[in-house]
Amino acid sequence: MKSHLHGAAPLLALAACLAAAPASAHAEDADSTIIVTAPLQTDAAKARAAQTPGGTDVVSYEDYADKSVVSLRDTLAFSPGVYLQPRYGQEVRISIRGSGLSRGFHMRGLTLLQDGVPINLADDNGDFQELEPIFFDHLEVYRGANALRFGSGTLGGAINGVTPTGRSAKGVYLRAEAGSFDMLRALVSAGVAGDRVDAWGAISADTSDGDRDHAKRRSFRFQGNVGLDLSDNISTRFYASFNNINQQLPGALTRAQALTTPKMANAASAAGDQQRDIDSLRLQNRTRIDLGAATLELGGFVNAKSLFHPIFQVIDQKSTDVGGFARLDYAAGPVELTLGGEVRNGKAKAKQFVNIAGRRGALTFDADQKAQTASLYGEMRVRPVERLSLIAGGVYADGWRERRVNFSASPAGDGRIGFDAFSPKFGLLFEPSDRVQIFANYSRSAEFPGFGEVFQTIGTPPVSSLVSDIRPQRAWTAEIGTRGTAGIAHWDVAFYRSTLKGEMLQFTTNASIPAATFNADRTLHQGIEAGLDLDVAPWLRLRQTYAYSDFRFRNDAQFGDNRLPVVPRHMYRAELRVGTDALHVAPSLEWVPQGPFADYANRVRTPGYALLGVTGGMTVADGFDAFVDVRNITGKKAIGDISAVLAANAASAIYYPVERRAISAGVRARF
């Protein structure tokens, strides 16, 4: 795997300055804490989420502090309605309400944000590996149309990772851990604040051989921000992030291999030294202007990214995305109004080479790709009576994708295609008491195809060309639910039903080539998203989530009413935390009673499974903690994820095994 650490020298210098600056100032502070941040940002996020008439969740750093945080799965496992299954390393399948259901690589159907600014590329695809959850103060999950405040009109909604500031995370914080498969991880962060200026920065490094052959990973990351109070009414914050991620790809296995020898790698993946290596640098700004009854936020970003991705060929892309956004929030009496817009414009130099054991061979393809996605959104909230809010809003989005082929060893064509859609939303929020809410909404979503869907290699002989009849995926979703607290119980339950037209579905053509995409006619996604926490005593807490997912075709000409593959109908997770912050242990369970289908023909279903784990932590000294994370205690062999095919058979290499037994332990400290 290649290394680019030499480009990180300026970032190391900046982080060192940040680490040194607060040390002496913090020595005068008698209070010490082990958590990364103060809860102020998280509390504010929870207050905003509580005003949303639909499924939302805020996950604080404390909720996953004892875990070995490798991917988003480690942070959002107990967020209701979020389906996450690890494949290897930081690669996970992430889906909400069946979003991007058959996309087994990169990501589709969700808007990913960091500090409120999308990290999705201009064609709306993205790499979730660029979100490093170990840096975050908290994560905000807005499911479905409830993500309107972020300008998202996708089926799945939005996930926003929020980093600390110098005011919420003063001092120096250290975290280090080691574990199975030669895993080593470390984090150092520092924050400092003055009267009108604050700064925060962090560096993380990670290395592991992986729990499968040919699954080594290496990463080096930096995050930082500087905030300025320009006046009593105007503040601005500048953000910078750098990612150097090197990940070998072990590939998918046959059913028999996944259930008997899950450690092995796919033969083609190993022979081709398949990898996904990402270098990215992101700069962004957010400026806030207080106008009295209204608040205006505006800003922009630039993201430079390099992708080196040997698979069936070596994909070598260099892209630059720029964008801007603005949002106005107004509140006066019983009326609240949000108006906003954003635009993302990107260009990429996309090349492909013959894969010679993971190295570039002869050039086979060279194209210039351009894309733009823009949206305007608005939402009005009216309280006709004290405990009832009525909400109406909508998102208008348009975009285009364009490709110009400079060279191709096989037939390939230029092309350009555009899309637009309006997605309205209507909802209500009723609060029968101060601690109970009942909500309902009805909304439309629209998802535009990305480059992988717009330009496909099809036919015999294969031709890479514009698929002019590819359509946006559209859906109407009805949702009703409740959240609240009563006695020892805190609950969050939502029922949803989405009727889709043109769902973008994919099927694997072979083990190394990314899937082909087609628009289904009519499909149905319906289910239950439930979370129930029981605070039995100060030293005893039970966390539970349950998801019921019924995804199927509707009178399809080829597949009838078959179930859609990949996501199981039932999934239950539970964690029982016993003890206090001084000493605690938390056994956990992930249970899938019956696995999902692996194909659209519904010929093959994977077996169910139950995975047991445990985490624990203790306070060693003031400001110094130790923690341990044990996964898959029994060494269960099971299938965790699938790359869907039209009709599976015994030779289909489409299965990813669950994580093997692993143990890690670490320490964290604040000075």
Residue ranges and their predicted role:
Residues V385-L390, D398-G399, Y496-T499, F518-Y600, ...:
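Gram-negative outer-membrane beta-barrel transporters
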Residues G171, A178-T207, R212-P250, Q274-L291, ...:
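Transmembrane beta-barrel wall of Gram-negative outer-membrane proteins
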Residues A38, A446, K501, W591-A598, ...:
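C-terminal beta-signal and adjacent terminal beta-strands/loops
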Residues R73-V117:
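Extracytoplasmic beta-strand/coil segments of soluble accessory domains associated
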Residues D31-K67, V92-R93, L110:
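N-terminal periplasmic "start-of-domain" segments of outer-membrane beta-barrel proteins
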Residues V197, L296-F308, E431, Q437-S443, ...:
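Membrane-embedded beta-barrel scaffold of Gram-negative outer-membrane proteins
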Residues L110, V117-R143:
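Short acidic/polar hinge/loop motifs at secondary-structure boundaries
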Residues T338-S433, F448, Q558:
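Signature of Gram-negative outer-membrane beta-barrel scaffolds
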